[in-house]
C-alpha cells in the first residue's frame, strides 16, 4: 500500500508573532518543515510528498533542503491549500491513499504515523486522536493559574 503526503506550510503564522513564518523557524539546524520531512522520508510507503507553500515565502523555501518533494502554491486558507494539493494529487495515477500533516507541528511520533499507515489497510479513513493535557494548573492556594 502506497501513500502520498501533503505537508501544509502555506499559512501566514499570524498568531506566532514573528517576521519569519513558523514552518521556517529552526530547532537546532533544521527548520520545522525539514524536521517533519526527515521523519516522513523514513517511510517507504510514502511515495510522493507535496509541500504546500505560501507564494510570499518562496525566499525562505529556497533555502531549505526539500529533497523528494513537489512544491505547490497554497491558498488563502488551510482548507484552500489542502484542496489545491488534492487537485494536483488527482492527476497522478494510483494515488488514492493520502496523508495530510501541518508543517508547523514537527513533534509527531513516527510510531503514530506507523499506526496510521497500518490502520489505513483496514479502514478507508483514519484520523488520529491524541490526549490533550490541561493548560490550567491548580497551585497550592487552591487557585487556578493559566500556564502559557
PLM feature spans:
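N-terminal glycine-rich phosphate-binding loop and ensuing alpha1 helix
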Residues: 2-58
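Conserved core of the sugar-phosphate nucleotidyltransferase
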Residues: 43, 107-148
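Short phosphate-binding loop-to-helix
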Residues: 64-96
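Residues at the starts of beta-strands that form the adenosine-phosphate
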Residues: 47-49, 97, 124
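Acidic helix N-cap motif at the loop->helix transition within catalytic regions
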Residues: 58-64
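Acidic metal-phosphate-binding loop of nucleotide-sugar-dependent transferases
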Residues: 14, 78, 103-107, 134
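Short beta-strand segments
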Residues: 6-10, 52, 100-101, 127-131
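Short beta-strand-to-loop acidic/aromatic patch adjacent to the donor-nucleotide binding site
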Residues: 94-105
Amino acid at each position: 500500500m502506497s501513500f502520498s503526503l501533503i505537508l501544509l506550510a502555506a499559512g501566514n503564522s499570524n498568531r506566532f508573532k514573528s517576521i519569519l513564518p513558523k514552518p521556517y523557524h529552526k530547532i537546532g539546524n533544521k527548520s520545522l518543515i525539514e524536521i517533519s520531512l526527515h521523519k516522513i522520508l523514513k517511510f517507504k510507503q510514502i511515495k510522493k510528498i507535496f509541500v504546500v507553500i505560501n507564494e510570499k515565502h518562496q525566499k525562505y523555501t529556497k533555502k531549505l533542503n526539500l529533497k523528494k518533494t513537489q512544491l505547490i502554491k497554497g491558498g488563502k486558507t488551510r482548507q484552500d491549500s489542502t484542496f489545491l494539493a488534492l487537485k494536483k494529487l488527482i492527476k497522478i495515477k494510483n494515488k488514492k491513499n493520502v496523508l495530510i500533516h501541518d508543517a508547523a507541528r514537527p513533534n509527531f511520533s513516527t510510531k503514530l504515523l506507523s499506526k496510521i499507515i497500518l490502520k489505513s489497510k483496514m479502514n478507508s479513513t483514519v484520523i488520529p486522536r491524541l490526549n490533550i493535557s490541561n493548560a490550567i494548573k491548580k497551585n497550592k492556594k487552591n487557585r487556578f493559574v493559566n500556564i502559557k
